[in-house]
From Swiss-Prot:
Protein name as it appears in the record: 4-diphosphocytidyl-2-C-methyl-D-erythritol kinase
Organism: Neisseria gonorrhoeae (strain ATCC 700825 / FA 1090)
Recorded GO MF terms: 4-(cytidine 5'-diphospho)-2-C-methyl-D-erythritol kinase activity; ATP binding
Pathway listed: Isoprenoid biosynthesis; isopentenyl diphosphate biosynthesis via DXP pathway; isopentenyl diphosphate from 1-deoxy-D-xylulose 5-phosphate: step 3/6
BP GO annotations: isopentenyl diphosphate biosynthetic process, methylerythritol 4-phosphate pathway; terpenoid biosynthetic process
Residues the record marks as active site: K15, D140
Length: 281
């Protein structure tokens, strides 16, 4: 969508981890994971306006983060060296995905910047080259560049497309910010889950999140949200938290539960997607 001042609008959808297992710790300190990533229609909007002077300007950094530390700014900076001309861009973020929630909002914004600017700046990078570039920004960025529901392994760069049944999700966000670094360094964190031999949606059930027990112990508010949503369905934490979600087959069922919990928590009703909206642009 074009705006009167020359900006163009691009979607940046959120994700849920329907299953998340930690299969080991690497020599570099990072962890190997296996996870089912699912796109949902809760999304930010990234507004971009091209410049021809090489400047990258982020007009509204999120949460007081310095411009140079924002993932969207860093994404443009990383890609700029591949541009054919003196390429620049102005960036605005319309945030609808809550931060510190395990929904991948910042990573999705960065992926959208990479996908669009790769075309605008005529960088010519393939999808897998963009995935390698995005991995330097964060473990969730490769999935959003991949652009469809997937089984991810390793540090998030190994991606296999996965068919996920159409579902609706009720998501609640407790009033707390979970430190991902704190959870990954927790001594009692499960780090030895067995790797999946045949990773299909059916074979991986029952789903679980290896970080959930530690987060519940360290952040009681997340446990309370889980307990509340569990009254209505099979609830689970996404990512390292803090959001809790439950899946439903019918929109009406999900909507009724959403109404129940929205008076207690910041809550969202979201539909699962099969592919990134940018794949249709």
């Amino acid at each position: 969508m074009n705006i009167a001042d020359g900006r163009q609008a691009f979607p940046a959808p959120a994700k849920l981890n329907l299953d998340l297992r930690i299969t080991g710790r690497r020599e570099d300190g990072y962890h190997n994971i296996e996870s089912i990533f699912c796109l949902i229609d809760l999304q930010d909007t990234v507004y971009l306006k091209p410049r021809d002077d090489g400047k990258i300007i982020l007009h509204n950094p999120v949460g007081g983060i310095p411009q140079e530390a924002d993932l969207s700014y860093r994404a443009a900076s990383l890609l700029q060296k591949y541009a054919r001309n003196l390429a620049g861009v102005e960036i605005w973020l319309d945030k609808k995905i809550p931060t510190g929630a395990g929904l991948g909002g910042g990573s999705s914004d960065a992926a959208t910047v990479l996908l669009v600017l790769n075309r605008w700046w005529q960088c010519g990078l393939t999808q897998w080259q963009l995935i390698d570039l995005g991995a330097a920004l964060g473990a969730d960025v490769p999935f959003f560049i991949f652009g469809k529901n997937a089984f991810a392994s390793g540090i998030g760069k190994k991606l296999i497309g996965m068919d996920i049944p159409k579902q609706w999700y009720v998501i609640v966000k407790p009033p707390v910010h979970v430190s991902t670094a704190k959870i990954f360094t927790y001594e009692g964190l499960t780090r030895d889950s067995a790797s999946s031999i045949m990773p299909t949606f059916q074979n991986l059930q029952p789903f679980r999140n290896d970080m959930q027990a530690v987060v519940f112990k360290e952040y009681p508010e997340v446990w309370k949200a889980y307990s509340e949503l569990s009254k209505y369905g099979s609830a689970m934490m996404t990512g390292s938290g803090a959001c809790i979600f439950a899946a439903f087959q019918a929109r009406n069922s999900a909507y009724n539960i959403y109404r129940q919990v929205s008076g207690l928590y910041e809550a969202y009703l979201a539909e699962g997607l099969s592919k990134h909206p940018l794949l249709s642009v």
